[in-house]
Amino acid sequence: EGPNIGLISYLASYAKINEYGFVEAPYRKVKKTYDEKGRLIDQVVTDEVEYMTADVEDEYVVAQANEPLDETKHFKRARVSARRRDDILEIDAEKVDYMDVSPRMMVSVATACIPFLENDDCNRALMGSNMQRQAVPLMVTQQPIVATGMEYKAATDSGTAVLAKNDGIVEKVDADHVEVRNAQGAVDNYSLVKFARSNAGTCINQRPIVEVGENVKAGQVLADGPAMRNGEISLGKNALIG
């Protein structure tokens, strides 16, 4: 997209930076059991997650995240879709070492908010993910009818929402404050930001979404921030026809 392509990059979902500054991604480990003669007798996909850099991952066969598993977490098919280095191949299940944790791990959080991304033209997806950053927060927000499941996590991790510190019961709510009595009997007081100016010149306004007497859990959204509705990221309006 223009001369600045490649200058601004975003981490893929689930990726993180290790102590040496390299990008690491998580993979589910495939546990293999051999008999005394070295023959494979069992292979199960575990919930144990291992982070690897790209050069380490190159040495292993990695199955796709949407490869079907049975109830005991064994591969359903004898041959599975996997990759090794730059090759996408169909390979015997017994040769698989790891499995992707999610189909969306290759895209950023913004791209993962695009519904039916796999049916989208790649240029449109590129423009759409970039343009989400340019959205101006609306005065009256509307959560998306068609969503991908990333909206709540993106909103709560944005830092603009007010989250409950502890479990408790809401005792007082007004436009400026929320008070929650926690399990220890102490009162947690939350002050809301009202009509403040952001660095981009947009309006930061937090609105409470809980009611007096409501039970809340630690980490639950107490007040929406800008471009949020009911704890979900809400950048635009639903285009309704008819």
Feature annotation, model-predicted:
Residues 207-216:
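Acidic, glycine-anchored pre-beta loop/turn
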Residues 1, 8-16, 22-207, 220-242:
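Long, charge-dense accessory insertions within large macromolecular proteins
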